[in-house]
Amino acid sequence: MSATTTTENAKTSHITLPVPAAKHALKLDGSDPSYGDWRDDLVRDGYAIIKGAVPRERADSYADAMYSWLEGFRKASAKTRTDKDKLPWIDQKGMCLQYAVTHEDFAWAIRSEPGVVEAFEKVYDDKDLIVSFDAINFGFPNRKDLPENKPWPHQDQDPLKPGFRCLQGLVNMLPNGPDDGGLIVCRGGHMLSEEFHREFINEERIPAWTPEWFGFTDAGMKWLEEKGCQWEKVCAEPGDLLVWDSRTPHYNLSSKTQQPRFCVYTCFMPVADASQDDLVRKRDAFERWVGTTHWPNARHTGSNVGKRDGEDDPHNRFEPVNKPSLDERAFKLTGIPYIKA
């Protein structure tokens, strides 16, 4: 198998692998057995922390690579003065998806870390997985050049498609304490998802660009509170993997301290759950160095065109600064080897 991208472009060649039958994934519906590890937390609470999924030394090196990427962008904008212009476009939630950043070598190295991949293999009981080309989070505290990061509680799953369908994740790269911003989840909310959406079926929905996103209104938040659900800020150390059921209500907070927040969003699913059209679309995203949402089947693909004040960023990039070199295991995560010739 040719399982390594070239240094000039992302055109790929491969030997087609058979798409295996679906395995026995966790159900997260109260019927799962006890596992004696973090999976019990996931089943009960709708989220879990896998401590040290990435060894600390490597996590620190990835954080350094992320800083270097930002500093390289800053050098390209050396004649400007404001923070906004010295950085790539990063929204108030800390997310960056343009500039081909989602395919930088550090992003792929993090996605293909054994401890990260193995965690998702345990959930899906499957080694034939594909991974999302999702956003990178560069959350800097006290930025005055961005809008306020207001709470945006949501679930990343279409209410009309119930049940456990997707496990979201992020790999944390810097110390992340209770006041350092980051992921906040509604503990146990995943188990109430179907009941909630039955009761709120006629509520006017918050506008969204995809049906796979549902925002919770004040009435919805009150309902969750009355059901005894509590919101918990998830704290983590460098190298920890955070995972959550996409039905679990969640959002992210901005830091109240001087501590930045760096993380890489990582979501895996069995390749058996993706169609051949999905895989072809995913290959196109990989070859164009563009990102996807958290859905690994590339339901939606993005763009590398960052905008500033409505205009294309003059420092847009359309390929990674440091292109990834993927071994056979990582290349399978692109989904390309499973495309039928």
Model region roles, listed by residue range:
Residues 14, 20-23, 201, 238-243, ...:
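Non-heme Fe(II)/2-oxoglutarate
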Residues 166, 176-249:
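Double-stranded beta-helix
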Residues 135, 140, 155, 167, ...:
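Short, structured patches in soluble enzyme cores that scaffold and shape functional sites
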Residues 140-141, 186-194, 267-273:
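Short edge-strand/loop segments of extracellular domains
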Residues 47, 133, 164-170, 180-182, ...:
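Extracellular structured ligand-interaction cores
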Residues 103-109, 155-157, 220-233, 251-254:
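Active-site rim elements
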Residues 122-130, 159-163, 172-180, 192:
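Secondary-structure boundary elements
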Residues 2-44, 51-160:
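Non-heme Fe(II)-dependent double-stranded beta-helix
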